[in-house]
Amino acid sequence: MLSAVLLLAAAPARAGTAGGSSPALARLKADLAGPESATQVLTRWCGELHLAEPGRIRAVRVHQDKPAAHWIRQMLHARPRERLRYRRVQLMCGAHILSEADNWYRPARLTAAMNRILDTTDRSFGAVVRPLNFHRRTLSRQSDTDAMTPLRLTAVLETPDGEPFSLVVENYRPILVMPPRHSH
């Protein structure tokens, strides 16, 4: 599975598809490859696309559990008996879902306060762990995975010393690359 994920990182967008040839999709990919967190990028896009006033992102938790596959545990360097937590959120701008994310993380690498916030609130993971001064390492980038997902990113979040603490699979929605037309 790990080799399949890494091969997908090099897979080009399908030529001729709306998402694959979209300048907006190319810009979204470039922005998400930059130093900002996904939440910061989506906050900026929310405002630029005028999807809501104010252009703010909120995370809505989807309460469910999903065990980490073996390859996820490997990518996170999790010890054999180490417990991982799972969190699924929808990042929304007003009434619009911009992305849905599956996140497996190592609670032992976070502070007690961070774990409490993640367990009891809808705050985005990136906002909560920002004090760790983490960086993202993209493992794969897939375009046009299905009609509702013009872009899927798989990334690992790492501390400045290179220790992985989170693996996230982000599914970005069409509204980002084909926003609704507003009449003026």
Give residue ranges: language-model regions.
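Well-ordered beta-strand positions
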Residues: 1, 90-92, 158
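N-terminal domain-onset segments
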Residues: 14-92, 96-145, 162-168, 172-184
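Long terminal accessory segments
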Residues: 150-158
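Bacterial N-terminal signal peptides
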Residues: 1-9
